């Protein structure tokens, strides 16, 4: 066992501090005059503080001997010069060395107490107004509150960045709130894993059978399964999973579930032969979506008089002749209020949508086009010649901090002006977003939902597009014919082969489709890097920024985590003068391709033409345009939408040189390099391979194991998603409803 070393002294300087995890490198000046390098989780530390550090020596290859902290005692500075160093270090914005010196000269050892408790006394110093005094006091009070909260969390090995979210939600009382019920940390605000909060709560003395623990575990299981696509869970599965999580009896858990139902936190309803348990917001989304969709289906929308003559006019104007199913879809748009249009690549969905748009224009309707992601909306605009926007922006999605939930400007109280709405990439739309869209439609609005039912389902809960099709309650057109021009593309031919359960043709040069067999993961990684850095740019004249690497998984040699690190080194290496920020174990550098990984409704962005808006959404892709000299902020550019991000917001983004196939849904790239190696069984399925192939527009290069690819094509297993939408549509009007 290594000998524990103890050193006591004053923080001389902070060399490095990671805002996300609190990892810090500092210089400690001991009373003997020794300067010791200390490393460890020491959040919110500043020069002048007094530390007692217990740990072990380690030798860093570049920085030499350093003390790795295992235990830590810290106190605020108690000497005037230490107080000056602390105050002038930046702990209180707006107080630099000059102002700090004047404050310490006036108040001496009482300085920190006065700043926190009696900031109005700062007016005793010439040049500090009443307003300035209160501003300094408030900033210092916030700093001290955040410091105490970080110290509290660090005792339970919780990341310091969590303190920012807790303080935003609960203010000065955050510690009291967490002490009263630590299980709140596993809610939507903080998202801490239940096992972590459970360990914390039990160490604080909470009983194993306490109400807080039982209810938190049930909610955690429902939320966890929501994140895996389920709208509800069967009651027996929920109870079994929760009992296993808690190692307790079913009677206690069932009583807690009944209590949650009484408090309206969950809804229990029989769906077919299943007793379904919903989080209340998901139950409301599903039932509302069903009711509003049925109302649209019941409206009298028959404008058959337009159909035959108008479709013929459109064909003449556009210089085309529709295939029978395309004509059927365009005519249906005039006859019914809601239609579904589905088909794979090359089957003419875009041509059909253009025809429906032309039809609605001739009917004099106000038309709105939308898609789930910014890239899908941009592509929809390019293909139709009309403006399209994301569903989120169409509905005016914002974040209500007080209620801690998403809200929409467009609802039944303030509906959209549109008389016809066309939504593309419907397979990506989850039940909550679909419900919000329907709430914003006026009675009588025509609705056209377009997508590819064979692609992966939405990341969010539900299987909306598939449920709508399988209900057989809505007029649906299946485009199956691959047109001659599209048939010339090996990408499209192979995508349809995969969709039929056949392996793609992996032999030879097929023009826009190449396969490079690599059965060793490290060789596959090396090939992917070579393709992106030299072979494709040099031989195919495709710039690296137009190449997207896709992979089924995040983990492993061919996962996004490893590939992004290596691709960043290859395509955007560290160079003198290029700024970068270390965030956790990741480096973000000017020029990096990045992706928004969770919705942020408050981000303010601006375009070059002066257009201003708010909100960045999960899956938005951009690049780092600038990093401030001090590293306190970044400027990000998302396809022309430029937004400032604080360092704390780096938890919302990730590198995007490589993306998972799921994340790439709704996007299309000039060139796709697919790393296809054996992975988790749930990812080695046909839907993942099919979705990956259909992301490539001009060139697809598959690098990987041919046996794994054939296995994926043959495996049509789909993960079951618990959803009641299809059942509700089919049983509308039943007494059980």
Language-model segments: which ranges?
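Loop/turn positions that initiate beta-strands
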Residues: 48-50, 591, 619
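Conserved helicase motor core of P-loop NTPases
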Residues: 453-615, 625, 732
